[in-house]
């Protein structure tokens, strides 16, 4: 993937850039793997906003991605197309399996149209192949990793994400996560070899607010710019600093939010580095 920069023909174009999509081989998705997707605008079934800054944007269709792949062990597949997916930062690859079934997977870096992909313990260690962590050599870079065996990929699914397999001891495997956190997972959990493609996506300059609105991202308004009825930092005569320590719109103190009593904390060897207060 490359990035194409625009000339400053308008204020919105000045400094903005866009992906060149050279790796994409088809513009329309596989019809059998597409489902309708209704925009929720960040609201729950009661109509209340539960996730701020969401709404609007272009209508999308959901592409069904195979995050498990365990039921295709020993069945080879051919990469038919690399496609754009509006629902994620990564590209997706359409696989044609030898038994006639078609499925989407996340497209790893350097995976190309026509490549052969395999699943299961006998698969080679090459990008796109999916197998259990206990069958992958220590030091290998992987992505789309399960948290629990058979639960489907949960870690390292966005563009450019990768996890390094640091060690394997008994029934557990030690991983270095994209955040820098080092944690252990069950060695039976599956992962896909390689890193997620489209790594340059993070370098795109959106140029104007309107391009983010096309993606369904609404403005982020500061609490001190609101009225007291809308935020604890709101109100005051003239511009004020908020008058208290930073809090959320619901009065929750700013800082770390992970519970120290969370059961899975025992599997975290080293926490990620963060600037947030404890």
UniProtKB/Swiss-Prot annotation:
Record GO biological process: cytoplasmic translation
Chain intervals with Basic residues compositional bias: 258-278
A GO term for molecular function: transferase activity
InterPro entries: NA-bd_OB-fold (IPR012340), Rib_uL2_dom2 (IPR014722), Ribosomal_uL2 (IPR002171), Ribosomal_uL2_bac/org-type (IPR005880), Ribosomal_uL2_C (IPR022669), Ribosomal_uL2_CS (IPR022671), Ribosomal_uL2_dom3 (IPR014726), Ribosomal_uL2_RNA-bd_dom (IPR022666)
Assembly with partners or alone: Part of the 50S ribosomal subunit. Forms a bridge to the 30S subunit in the 70S ribosome.
Role description: One of the primary rRNA binding proteins. Required for association of the 30S and 50S subunits to form the 70S ribosome, for tRNA binding and peptide bond formation. It has been suggested to have peptidyltransferase activity; this is somewhat controversial. Makes several contacts with the 16S rRNA in the 70S ribosome.
Protein name: Large ribosomal subunit protein uL2
Organism this protein belongs to: Streptomyces avermitilis (strain ATCC 31267 / DSM 46492 / JCM 5070 / NBRC 14893 / NCIMB 12804 / NRRL 8165 / MA-4680)
Lineage of origin: Bacteria, Bacillati, Actinomycetota, Actinomycetes, Kitasatosporales
């Amino acid at each position: 993937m490359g990035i194409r920069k625009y000339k400053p023909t308008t204020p919105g174009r000045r400094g903005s850039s866009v992906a060149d999509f050279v790796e994409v081989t088809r513009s329309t998705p596989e019809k059998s793997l597409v489902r309708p997707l209704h925009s929720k605008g960040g609201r729950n079934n009661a109509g209340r906003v539960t996730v701020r800054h969401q709404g609007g944007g272009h209508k999308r269709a959901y592409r069904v991605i195979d995050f498990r792949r365990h039921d295709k062990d020993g069945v080879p597949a051919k990469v038919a197309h690399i496609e754009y997916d509006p629902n994620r930062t990564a590209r997706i690859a359409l696989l044609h399996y030898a038994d006639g079934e078609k499925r989407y997977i996340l497209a790893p870096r350097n995976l190309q149209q026509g490549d052969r992909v395999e699943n299961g313990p006998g698969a080679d260690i090459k990008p796109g192949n999916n197998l259990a962590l206990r069958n992958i050599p220590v030091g290998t870079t992987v992505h789309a990793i399960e948290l629990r065996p058979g639960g489907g990929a949960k870690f390292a699914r966005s563009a450019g994400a990768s996890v390094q397999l640091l060690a394997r001891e008994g029934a557990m495997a030690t991983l270095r996560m994209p955040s820098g956190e080092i944690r252990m997972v069950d060695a039976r959990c599956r992962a896909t070899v390689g890193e997620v493609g489209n790594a340059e996506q993070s370098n795109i300059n959106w140029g104007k607010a309107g391009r983010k609105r096309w993606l369904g991202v609404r403005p982020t308004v500061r609490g001190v710019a609101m009225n007291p009825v809308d935020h604890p930092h709101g109100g005051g005569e003239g511009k004020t600093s908020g008058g208290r320590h930073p809090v959320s719109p619901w009065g929750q103190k700013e800082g770390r939010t992970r519970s120290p009593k969370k059961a899975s904390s025992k599997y975290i060897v080293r926490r990620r580095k963060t600037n947030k207060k404890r």
